[in-house]
Amino acid sequence: MTLAEEFKSRNFSIYGQWTGVLCIFLCFALGVANIFHPTFVIAFSIVCLVSSFVIIFIEIPLLLRICPTSPKFDAFIRKFSSNYMRAAIYGVMSVVQWISIWPQATSLIVAAIFLMVAAIFYALAGFKGQQFQGSKTLGGQGVAQMII
């Protein structure tokens, strides 16, 4: 299945996964950009940076196979294999970034918006009863097994 066919499949988990990939870049860039604020925003930017690395392992399953990680971390990441669990973690990460507006309004709101959109996509996939379908481009559905 090509990338265009994946998007035409109307499976919201595919949309959520690609929104999650966009969140990786946004969280990393905005976390670095906001880490130099002299206010309490630094804590939220660090959380945003950590979120970007967690999302990398959630959305790109191939990395769990090629990166040396601990069994505890692997078990933690594997908890987010269903649409509802992914919606939950994206929702929590989004709420944390929405709270970052309290000390000072910064560009972290963009990360909050996109994390919320990813959570909505995964929640819609769960509500519609769609099975989680990983994108082949990101290492889902057999790509990891082909490398090993």
UniProtKB/Swiss-Prot annotation:
Glycosylation sites: 11
Organism domain of life: Eukaryota
Key words, A-Z: Glycoprotein, Golgi apparatus, Membrane, Transmembrane, Transmembrane helix
Region forming the signal peptide: none
Cellular location(s): Golgi apparatus membrane
Membrane-spanning ranges: 12-32, 40-60, 82-101, 107-127
UniProt protein name: Golgi apparatus membrane protein TVP18
Organism in which the protein naturally occurs: Phaeosphaeria nodorum (strain SN15 / ATCC MYA-4574 / FGSC 10173) (Glume blotch fungus)
